[in-house]
Structures are given as C-alpha cells and as structure tokens.
Amino acid sequence: MSLYATQDEKKQAAAKAALKHLPKGGILGVGTGSTVNFLIDLLPELQLEAAVASSQATADRLKKLGIEVVDMNHVGSLDAYVDGADEIDRHMHMIKGGGAALTREKIVASIAKKFVCIVDDSKWVDQLGRDFPLPVEVIPMARSAVARKLVSLGGDPVYREGVVTDNGNIILDVFNLNILNAIDLEKTINNIPGVVTNGIFALNPATIAIVATNDGIEERTAQ
C-alpha cells in the first residue's frame, strides 16, 4: 500500500521535503522539469532574494510567482541548486536532459555549493542508461559526425525530432550505452567536436537525493 495515489503526488512530496535543504533568502539555482515545477510553486515560502533559472520555461514560471530571475553572469556562486533527474544511482550520478535543458542545468549547477536532487523512486536505478537514453546536445552542423562517433562508442543515437534547445541546438538521444564508468563517459562524449554537453552528471554529482517512495520520503547520499 503506497502513501501516494499517483506519481505526481510522489513528486509533490519530494518537492516539499526538499525545502528544508534550501536556503531562506539568498539566490537559488533552479532546474527544469515536472518535479521542479512542483517545487517552484512552493518557493515563495523561502522568501528568496532571486533565482537563477536553467531554462526559459523555469524563468517564466518563477516570474509568474513574483520571484526575480537574475542572469548567472551577475552571480558569483549559489548556496544551492535544486533539480530533478531522469535517472540517478547510488553514487549520486545522474542522467538529465529529458526536457532538453541539460546544458544550462549543468552550467547553473556548476556554481552551486550543493546540488539537491528531487525524484520519485521510479528514477532510482542500479545502472545509468539501461532504461533511459542519454541526451546529447549537439551543434546542428555536427549532427551526423557526432552520431557516428556515438555509434563507435556502442550507442544508438536517435535525433529528437522537432526539438531545439534554448541555445539553438539539437538533441541526440543515445540508446543502449553501457554506462559502467559515468565520469569517464561524460568526459569522452564531451570531447567529441560538435558536442555542447551530454546528460551525464557525474563530474558534478548530486549532494543529496530526496526520493519519494511508496513508504514516504528518503534522503540519500553517495555510497
């Protein structure tokens, strides 16, 4: 018997539980996605000075709630960055980018003192990449060249039709990658000419994961 009737209720619970890990006042980095949207609706409780958004969609939602959104170039560091994940493992390594905001998410997370990841337990996995493809943001002219390189790494890249990132680039979703060493693969793919970044977040993993399970909220850190 689950405490939650739907997956959305789990997402809401994870979002609410994350609030105590976020600073009151100050400037918060905010990610993108359905779970984060539940959190954004709760952010007025924190009386933030401002927020740095990882996507235009997040910026628009924050502004509607009266939260000032500032350019990251005017911010030295963030006390925290909060975001969801498409997959996360016990090392706090993640796959992100289902919403095509991976590059800006990775940039904003890079200046935060801690990364709070909020997920429901369907996103918790033993190994990254088995069930969810790895998104890779690519400069359009390099699409075919990058795809060939990804095939040589054992992946099956598929062009995400009709999607243009906030940076004007395209997404290749890479299926069937055997992600045994997430840090090495993140570096390898990022070194392919034409790749902006990929959706492995292992070089800068989550600090803590707030996981909504059938039995309630669990707080998990790297093992």
Curated annotation (Swiss-Prot):
One cellular-component annotation, GO: cytosol
InterPro entries registered for this protein in UniProt: NagB/RpiA_transferase-like, Ribose5P_isomerase_typA_subgr, Ribose5P_isomerase_type_A
Enzyme nomenclature, EC number: 5.3.1.6
Catalytic reaction(s) noted: aldehydo-D-ribose 5-phosphate = D-ribulose 5-phosphate
CDD domains: RPI_A
Pathway as given in its UniProt record: Carbohydrate degradation; pentose phosphate pathway; D-ribose 5-phosphate from D-ribulose 5-phosphate (non-oxidative stage): step 1/1
Binding, substrate: T32, G33, S34, T35, D83, G84, A85, D86, K96, G97, G98, G99, K123
Active site as annotated: E105 (proton acceptor)
GO function terms (MF aspect): ribose-5-phosphate isomerase activity
Keyword annotations: Isomerase
Biological processes per GO annotation: D-ribose metabolic process; pentose-phosphate shunt, non-oxidative branch
UniProt xrefs under PANTHER family: RIBOSE-5-PHOSPHATE ISOMERASE (PTHR11934:SF0)
Subunit field text: Homodimer.
HAMAP family: Rib_5P_isom_A
Function in brief: Catalyzes the reversible conversion of ribose-5-phosphate to ribulose 5-phosphate.
Protein family per UniProt: Belongs to the ribose 5-phosphate isomerase family.
NCBIfam families reported for this sequence: PRK00702.1 (NF001924), rpiA (TIGR00021)
Protein name per its UniProtKB record: Ribose-5-phosphate isomerase A
Lineage: Bacteria, Pseudomonadati, Pseudomonadota, Gammaproteobacteria, Moraxellales
Gene: rpiA
